[in-house]
Amino acid sequence: MSFHASLLREEETPRPVAGINRTDQSLKNPLLGTEVSFCLKSSSLPHHVRALGQIKAKNLASCDYYLLFRQVVLPPEVYPIGVLIRAAEAILTVIVSAWKLDHMTKTLYSSVRYALTNPRVRAQLELHIAYQRIVGQVSYSREADIGPKRLGNMSLQFIQSLVIATIDTTSCLMTYNHFLAAADTAKSRCHLLIASVVQGALWEQGSFLDHIINMIDTIDSINLPHDDYFTIIKSISPYSQGLVMGRHNVSVSSDFASVFTIPESCPQLDSLLKKLLQLDPVLLLMVSSVQKSWYFPEIRMVDGSREQLHKMRVELETPQALLSYGHTLLSIFRAEFIKGYVSKNAKWPPVHLLPGCDKSIKNARELGRWSPVFDRRWQLFAKVVILRIADLDMDPDFNDIVSDKAIISSRRDWVFEYNAAAFWKKYSERLERPPARSGPSRLVNALIDGRLDNIPALLEPFYRGAVEFEDRLTVLVPKEKELKVKGRFFSKQTLAIRIYQVVAEAALKNEVMPYLKTHSMTMSSTALTHLLNRLSHTITKGDSFVINLDYSSWCNGFRPELQAPLCRQLDQMFNCGYFFRTGCTLPCFTTFIIQDRFNPPYSFRGEPVEDGVTCAVGTKTMGEGMRQKLWTILTSCWEIIALREINVTFNILGQGDNQTIIVHKSASQNNQLLAERALGALYKHARLAGHNLKVEECWVSDCLYEYGKKLFFRGVPVPGCLKQLSRVTDSTGELFPNLYSKLACLTSSCLSAAMADTSPWVALATGVCLYLIELYVELPPAIMQDESLLTTLCLVGPSIGGLPTPATLPSVFFRGMSDPLPFQLALLQTLIKTTGVTCSLVNRVVKLRIAPYPDWLSLVTDPTSLNIAQVYRPERQIRRWIEEAIATSSHSSRIATFFQQPLTEMAQLLARDLSTMMPLRPRDMSALFALSNVAYGLSIIDLFQKSSTVVSASQAVHIEDVALESVRYKESIIQGLLDTTEGYNMQPYLEGCTYLAAKQLRRLTWGRDLVGVTMPFVAEQFHPHSSVGAKAELYLDAIIYCPQETLRSHHLTTRGDQPLYLGSNTAVKVQRGEITGLTKSRAANLVKDTLVLHQWYKVRKVTDPHLNTLMARFLLEKGYTSDARPSIQGGTLTHRLPSRGDSRQGLTGYVNILSTWLRFSSDYLHSFSKSSDDYTIHFQHVFTYGCLYADSVIRSGGVISTPYLLSASCKTCFEKIDSEEFVLACEPQYRGAEWLISKPVTVPEQIIDAEVEFDPCVSASYCLGILIGKSFLVDIRASGHDIMEQRTWANLERFSVSDMQKLPWSIVIRSLWRFLIGARLLQFEKAGLIRMLYAATGPTFSFLMKVFQDSALLMDCAPLDRLSPRINFHSRGDLVAKLVLLPFINPGIVEIEVSRINSKYHAVSEANMDLYIAAAKSVGVKPTQFVEETNDFTARGHHHGCYSLSWSKSRNQSQVLKMVVRKLKLCVLYIYPTVDPAVALDLCHLPALTIILVLGGDPAYYERLLEMDLCGAVSSRVDIPHSLAARTHRGFTIGPDAGPGVIRLDKLESVCYAHPCLEELEFNAYLDSELVDISDMCCLPLATPCKALFRPVYRSLQSFRLALMDNYSFVMDLITIRGVDIRPHLEEFDELLVVGQHILGQPVLVEVVYYVGVVGKRPVLARHPWSADLKRITVGGRAPCPSAAGLRDEDCRGSLLVGLPAGLTQLLVVD
C-alpha cells in the first residue's frame, strides 16, 4: 500500500509536509464512494468546497463513473508509431535467429505489424498513451489542484484527492482512484488487443481479434444499473464454463449455465459467447477468463459491511450439534494424520490409547503399520489421542513475519481510522482523540521500535488463554480490484494477534499439513502444475470426473464449537497450553470495525459502539484469511466422511474454499448417479458443520477442470496468457515507480504469462510490443525516433549493464538461465549479423566501462555478474537511506543495535576475504557468503525496501527525495543514450564461440579467471537437424526426439502418451542434512548448512586452514560454541553448484504440452552421457530447447513426421569439469557480526568418526539396500488412485545412474534381502509386494529397472551368477522381480548369502547415504561390460547339439541365418526392424560381426534389443551412429523380401535332408536368388552361453531340479497367502512340470486341471478334488520346450525323482 492524499491532513503526518498529492500511479486501493457522497452532503473541508464549485447540473454518481469514461473519443492518429513496428520486427528477428528458430520469423512479423496497424488496436493504444501522460503529470505533484486537462472530448479537473470529469453538460465527481481505475482499464484493453492479435496469428483457428472487439463493444453498450452491469461482468467467466460443460460433458450432465441471467439481461453478449462456443470451446474459455478489462465496480460499503457482519454471526446449527460434529471430524483427522505419518516415517506418532480402544489399533501401532481396514472404520480413532509431535517455533524468523502488513497498534487507536469532520457531520459531536498514536501502524515499524524483540512474551497470553483487552480489536479493510459489488474484507489486527496468526499457521503448515493428502498448501508451483496436468488428464480418459464445490462465504462459516475439539488435539500435539483453543474463541471477545474513513461508528467513552454496519462487538469468526490452514483441514475432513459414507473412491484437492473432488467411476453405478449421491452427501455434511453448500452452483464435469485459477479443458491447460497480459501493471508496490522497476515488473509479468500458456511465443512477442510502448511513454522523441538505437537498447540486458528487457528473458523458454552472459553476447552477435547495426552503435549503447576496483560484494551476490561501472539505481540509494534511518532511530531495540554495525562494509570485507580463493570459484564464494550473519542482515534490509513505512518512520527520507532520485535516474539513462561516446570496444567478444567470449569478458572485467560460472548458450551448443538425410557424424553426439505420430497444429493443444516434461527433477545439490537435536530457527538452519558444507568440503578433500578459520567464525557468530561437528546427512554436489535449494523441480518457462508427443533421451550423447565425468551441459535446457524447436516448426505451418535430433555442434562449448579443490590464500579478516536471534544453538551429543575406516562403497551399498527395501514397503501401501506424484519414499531418484554404477550391487541386493527377512512382513504386505513386482509397477521397481538397464550391473549381482540356474525367468523385468522375491522363493539360500556381509557394517546409518555415495565416487569402479556367447558355426566343427533360443519359435530360423553369415564370411550385416528381435539378438552375439540396424533416426528397436540382452553384446556389437543414420542397407541384410544383398529364408514343405548338426533343416537360404549351401556347417564349442539366449534353468539336469523344487515350495507358500492371484504362478510352475514329465518319458497332456486351496491350515495343490473347499484351475496349450530333449538324454536313470517332496512327485507322474 502506498500513501494517499490523506497525507495532507495535519493529524496524520509525523511532521509538516510539503504537500505531495495523488501519490499513486496505478490502482492499489478499493473504489469507495463515501468521500464523494460526504463531499456532496457537506461542505466542511476546503478542497471539498472547491470541488463542488466545478460540478455541472447533471452530475453522475461516482459509482457510474464508467458510463462517462466509455464516451471518451480521441482524434485519430495523434502519435506516430511507425518506428515501434519496425523496431519490434527487428528485435523479434534477432531473438528468433539467435535461437536458430528462423521459421518463426514470418509468423511473428505479420502478427506484430497487424497488431500495431489495425485501426481499432491503434486507437486503443493511443488512448492508453494519453491516459498515461496525464497520470504522469498529475501524480506526485506539489500543486494541490491541477487542471483542466484534456483527454479527447473529456476535460478533467484534479482537486487534491478528488477528480471532476466533464463531457459536454454531464459531470461526474469521483476520487482519484476512480480515474486510475479508468486508466487501468484502458491499459488493460490495449494489452488485451495486442496479445489477442499475436495469439491469433500463432494458433490453428486463426485470428479472433474481431470477436474481442465485438465483445468490448457489446459490453460497452450495456445500459443497466450499476449492480446489474457488474453482475453480468462477473458471470461471464462461469457462464462460459457452464456453456462448455453443457456441450462437451460426456458421462455427467451439467446445467450450471442455467444459474446465470446473461441470456435475459444481455442477449447480444449471450449470442456472442455461444458463437465462440461453436468456433472453439478453448477460445471461449480463454476470452471469458479476462475479467479486468471491463472497469471495476465501486464497493457499496453500507450493504456490503452489513452483510459481512451478519454472516460473521448467523447460526445455521445449534452450538451443541456443532460441538458433537466437531468430535466426529476429530476422529477422521486423527486417522488421516496417523496414516500420513506412517507412510512418511514408517512408524506411528506418539499416541495415547484410551480405555476401550480397539485391539486392531493396538496391534497396528506395535507393528508400526497402517491397516487398510482403518479407512472404513475411522470411528475407532475417537479412542486415540496423538501426543506431542513437535514444539511450537516460538521465535520465528523475521523474514516470515515482516511482510509489509498494516497493523493497528492498539485498541485506543481506532479513532485514527476515521475523519473527524465526517464524525461531526454524522453525530454532531466532536470525535475525541488521543494527542498521538500509541504506536506504529506497520509491522516493519514495530520491528524497528523493538516491539518484536521478545516474541515469546507477546505470545504468552495465548498460552494461558487470556488475551489483553487492548489487543482485541480488528479493522475490516475492503479488498481492492474485486468484481464483487458488496466487496470482500480483510482483517487488520493488532501486533500480538498478527504474530499469533503467523506462528499458528506456520506450525500447521510445517508439522501437520505435510501428512495430509487432501490439499495443495505445501506444494511447490511446479509440483502443482504436474499434479493438475495429471488430474485433468485422468478426468478426460473417462475413469473419473470432477466435482467443483462452491461454499457460500466459506471464511465466515467456521464457529468456535466446531473448531474446539481439533484445536484441543493440536494443543496436545504441540504441547502448548491453550494456544490453538484461544484462537477459536478469540472473535467472541473482539470488536470489529469497518475501515471506511468517512463513515465512522459512534464513540462512547472512547469505545466504538455496535451498530451492525460499521461496528460489531463480538462475533463467531475472525474474517477472511485468518485461520485458512486450520479451516482447510476441517473442510477436507467432512468431505472425506461424506464420500466414505456413500462408498465411492475419490481424491480431494483443496486449498481454502477452492475445493475439487475427483470421483472414480464404479462398476455398479453410472457417473451421473454417483455425482448426485456425492453432492447430496456433501451438502448434508457441510450443513452439519454449519456451512452452506450452494448445490446449484457446484458443477460436475468430465471435460473441464479448474483449480486455483488454472483451467484445463480435456486435459490441456487453457492458455492464460490473455488473462495475464491484460493484467500487466507496472506497479511493484515500489515506494516510487522508476523506469528500472517499471520495466523489471513488465518483464516479470511476461514471464508469468508464459508460465500460464502452452507456448512461450505469445508472451515473448506481446512482451516486446508492450515494452516498446512503455518506453514510448517514458523516453523523449529523440530516442524513440531512432530505430536502430531503439532496437539495440532493447537487446542490451542487465547482464552487461542495460535495462531489464523481455528480449534477454530466456526465461520465457526456461525459468531462469544458469548463465545469462553467453546468451546476451549471442543476441548482440546476431544483431550485427542480421541488421545493419554497426558495432560502434552497440558500443555506444552498452558503454561498457570497467569499474575502477573490483566490487567483490556484487560477485558474491550474483556469481554471473560483470565488474562494470553502471548508473546508480534508485533502489540502491534508497537502501542507503534506509540503513541510515534505522541507525538513527531513537529506539533501543535488537534490530537497531544490529543495524548499528556497518553492515555493508562488513559484507564487503567478507567478500574480499573470499576473493582470495585460488582458483576463484564465485559459486563457492556465494555459498560461503550466504552462511554468514551479514548476508542475513542484508536480506532483512531488503524487507524494508518495498515498504513505504520506513519513509514515514524516519525523519531522514522525504517522499520528495525519492521522487527526485527517480527522475535523476531516468535523466541519466537518457543522457547516456544521447551521448555519442563509446565505451570499451565489444568487437572481439562478438565473434566466434560465445562460451569462450563470455569467459574472456569475465576475465577482462574482474582481472582474474573465474572458474565454474560460465555455461554455454544452448542454441549455440546444439543445433537441430531433421533425421532425413542426417549423416552418421551427426549421431556421434546427439539427443534424439521421436514423435509419437505425425505432429500437426492440433497436437499443440492435445495430450500425447509421453510424460509431460517441465524439466527433470534435478537432484538436490547439497542435501539438507537433518542434524539431530538442533533447535528449529533460522540460526540453527544456517549453522546446519555451515556444518553440511564443512563436512562436504572434507569429503572433497578441501583441507585449508583459512577455510576452517572462516567456518569456525561463521559458527561462533551464531552462538554455536560446541566442538562437536555433528554427523550430517549431507550430499552430492553436482556441477560445482553448492546451492542449498532443495530439489528444483522443473525449469521450463511454459507448460510444455508438446513434450507429451515426443520421446527423447540423452543416451546417444556418447562422449558425454556415458562417461562418468561432468561436462558443461545443462540437460534441462537442452531437452526443452528440443521441444521448443518442434513447437516452432508446427506453429509456423510445418509438420513433424520423422524423428529429429539436436546434435552437438560447437566443440568449444563442451568443457570437462575438473576437480573442485580450492584454498583461501590469506588469513580471513572478517570477525563475525552480531546476531539477531537470542536463542543459543546447541548440538546434543558428541559424535565419533568410527565409520571412517569402512569402505565407503560397501557402506553406501548396504544403506541403499535398506532404503530400497523401505521404499518397497511404502509402495505396497500406496493406492493406485493416489494423486500425488509417484516418487520413491527414500527419494532414490536423486542418485544418478553413474553414481549407482560405481557400487557393488551384489552387496546392495544382499542388504535388501536382509532387510526383507528382518521386516517380518504381514500377509497382506507379502501379497502386495508379490502383486506389485509381478505387475512391474511402482516407483521403486522403476528405479531398479533403470539401474539394471546396464546389463553389466545386473550380472555383477554376484549371487546372480550362482543363483540364476534356479530362477525360471522370461525377461529382464521378470528376473529383477524374482531376484527381489528370492527370500520368499528360497529362504535357505538367501540366509547363507546374507551372512556374507561383514557384520560391522550393520552399524552404518542410512542417514549418511549421501556422504557415502560422495566418497564412493572417487574410489568406486564401474563393472566392465563382458560379452557372452551364442552357439556358432564353422565349416569343420564338432557337433554338440546346444542351440540358442531353444524355447522359441524362431530357433531354427536363427541357426540357419548364423550358418549363412559364417558361410559368406560376413563382417557387416544390416538388420531391418521387421526382423524378430530374438533373431537379431542372437546375431548380435556372433563375434567379429558388426551389426548395423536400419533405424532411420528412431532408436526404439535398438532399445528393445538392449532390454532383451543380458550381457554387453548388443551395446558393443551394434554400430549405433551408423544404425541411426541408416535408412536403407549398403551390403548384406536380412529383413526385406527382395533386393540386392538380401539374405532370405524359404520354408521347405517337407524336410528334404538331414543336416549334420540340425536334425532336420526347415529352411533353404538364398542370397539374392542364389541358394547358399550350408550343408557342411557344423558347431563350434560353446563356453559361456548368454543367459538371454540359453535359459540357465535348462542348462543342466541339476539346475532344472533345483528350479523345480524352489518353484514348487514358492507356489505352496503363495497358496497360503490371502489376496494373491495364484494363476500366473501356477502356469509358470506347470511349464517346468511339463519339461519334467517329458524327461521322465511321461505322456504330456495338452490340458490339465489343478485343484488349489488350504485345508486344515496346510496348502494343497492336487490333480483330484479331494476336498470341497478347493478351487479349480485349468491350464491348457501345454507342450514341452525343445530344451527338454537335451535334458532327457542326460537323465538316463530317472535320477530326477530322487529326493523330491512327495506332493511334487505325485504331480510329475501322470496316472
Swiss-Prot record:
InterPro entries: Mononeg_mRNAcap, Mononeg_RNA_pol_cat
GO function terms (MF aspect): ATP binding; mRNA 5'-cap (guanine-N7-)-methyltransferase activity; RNA-directed RNA polymerase activity
Motif Nuclear localization signal boundaries: 844-852
A single Gene Ontology CC term: virion component
UniProt-listed Enzyme Commission number(s): 2.7.7.48
Enzyme class, broadest EC rank: transferase
Catalytic activity as recorded in UniProt: RNA(n) + a ribonucleoside 5'-triphosphate = RNA(n+1) + diphosphate
Entry keywords, A to Z: ATP-binding, Host nucleus, Methyltransferase, mRNA capping, mRNA processing, Multifunctional enzyme, Nucleotide-binding, Nucleotidyltransferase, RNA-directed RNA polymerase, S-adenosyl-L-methionine, Transferase, Viral RNA replication, Virion
RdRp catalytic domain mapped to chain residues: 543-715
Pfam families, alphabetized: Mononeg_mRNAcap, Mononeg_RNA_pol
Compartment(s) of residence: Virion; Host nucleus
Quaternary context: Interacts with the P protein.
Function: Displays RNA-directed RNA polymerase activity. The viral mRNA guanylyl transferase displays a different biochemical reaction than the cellular enzyme. The template is composed of the viral RNA tightly encapsidated by the nucleoprotein (N). Functions either as transcriptase or as replicase. The transcriptase synthesizes subsequently three subgenomic RNAs, assuring their capping and polyadenylation by a stuttering mechanism. In replicase mode, the polymerase replicates the whole viral genome without recognizing the transcriptional signals.
Name this protein carries in UniProt: RNA-directed RNA polymerase L
Species annotation: Borna disease virus 1 (BoDV-1)
Lineage of the organism: Viruses, Riboviria, Orthornavirae, Negarnaviricota, Haploviricotina
Originating gene: L
